[in-house]
């Protein structure tokens, strides 16, 4: 017994044009045309969804994953270095406030970079090169070394001028930082209109900002590493309070005995017994 195959339904859209489709077959033509239109729309939506997903987190078309209702416009538009649209507190709602916060973040990020470096370098030099810093190698004990005999010993070199007066040290620091900050805020020594955040010139002796593409990349690297440095400095502060040791000594202790020297082990010491 041989089974007969069902007859194939002709593709009316390919057989006839819109104007040539016979009246008796108009219904079949319309059905196939509707299916084709739906398929085309689905394909267009898929392409649109694929292309929009690339801009989901970056650039002016990005949407914030934290704002599920999208009830307010997304103001960080990706035009600033390190802007990825994460502003759950709405700190960028007011442009003037956002401008101020951006300036404060960048200045503190730079201070964090220098501060984190200054917190670990004396300890590294004391351990690796054997420079006799004494207690001044620990960053939170360095200031107290001014009150010791001989004052603050720079690099263990007796021929250098050592800080022995905390008032004079503070005054010199205020003057030096005031001159630099005044230069930056006023746009140069004679109000030359330099960018207060990226003044260049004397602040860029190596010419790192000469190439625009390289400069844009360095801006992002600076703010990202600066944010990490600020968190690192916060961690160093907490370590100093909890352990009474510097960051390098804490790291050495942790590597020697991770089970006993870690954040959880120290946290349990402060729990009620």
Curated annotation (Swiss-Prot):
Protein localization: Plastid, Chloroplast thylakoid membrane
Residue positions binding chlorophyll a 4: 225
Post-translational modification, as annotated: Photoregulated by reversible phosphorylation of its threonine residues.
Chief location of this protein within or outside the cell: plastid
Residues binding chlorophyll a 1, per UniProt: 86, 92, 105, 227
GO molecular function, a single term: metal ion binding
Positions bound to chlorophyll b 5: 173, 270
Binding positions for chlorophyll b 4 per the UniProt entry: 173, 184
Annotated binding of chlorophyll a 5, by residue: 221, 239
SUPFAM superfamilies, per the entry: Chlorophyll a-b binding protein (SSF103511)
Binding site for chlorophyll b 2: 110, 161
Role noted for this protein: The light-harvesting complex (LHC) functions as a light receptor, it captures and delivers excitation energy to photosystems with which it is closely associated.
Entry similarity comment: Belongs to the light-harvesting chlorophyll a/b-binding (LHC) protein family.
Domain notes: The N-terminus of the protein extends into the stroma where it is involved with adhesion of granal membranes and post-translational modifications; both are believed to mediate the distribution of excitation energy between photosystems I and II.
Protein's name in the database: Chlorophyll a-b binding protein of LHCII type I, chloroplastic
Organism: Dunaliella salina
């Amino acid at each position: 017994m041989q089974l007969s195959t069902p007859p194939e339904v002709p593709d009316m859209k390919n057989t006839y044009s819109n104007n040539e489709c016979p009246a008796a077959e108009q219904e079949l033509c319309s059905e196939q045309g509707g299916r084709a239109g739906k398929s085309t729309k689905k394909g267009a939506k898929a392409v649109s969804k694929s292309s929009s997903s690339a801009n989901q987190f970056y650039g002016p078309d990005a949407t914030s994953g934290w704002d599920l209702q999208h009830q307010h416009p997304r103001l960080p538009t990706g035009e600033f270095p390190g802007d990825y649209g994460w502003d759950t507190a709405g700190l960028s709602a007011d442009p003037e406030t956002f401008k101020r916060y951006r300036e404060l973040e960048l200045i503190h990020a730079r201070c964090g970079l220098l501060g984190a470096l200054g917190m670990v370098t004396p300890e590294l030099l004391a351990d690796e090169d054997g420079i006799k810093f004494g207690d001044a190698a620990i960053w939170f004990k360095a200031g107290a070394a001014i009150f010791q005999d001989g004052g603050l010993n720079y690099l263990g070199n007796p021929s250098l001028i050592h800080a022995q007066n905390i008032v004079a040290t503070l005054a010199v620091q205020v003057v030096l930082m005031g001159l630099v900050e005044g230069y930056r805020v006023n746009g140069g020594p004679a109000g030359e209109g330099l960018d207060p955040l990226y003044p260049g010139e004397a602040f860029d002796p190596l010419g790192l900002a000469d190439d625009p593409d390289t400069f844009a990349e360095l801006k992002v690297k600076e703010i990202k590493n600066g944010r990490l440095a600020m968190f690192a400095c916060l961690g160093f502060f907490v370590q100093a309070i909890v352990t009474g040791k510097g960051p390098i000594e804490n790291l050495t202790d942790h590597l020697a005995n991770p089970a006993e020297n870690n954040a959880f082990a120290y946290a349990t010491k402060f729990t009620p017994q």
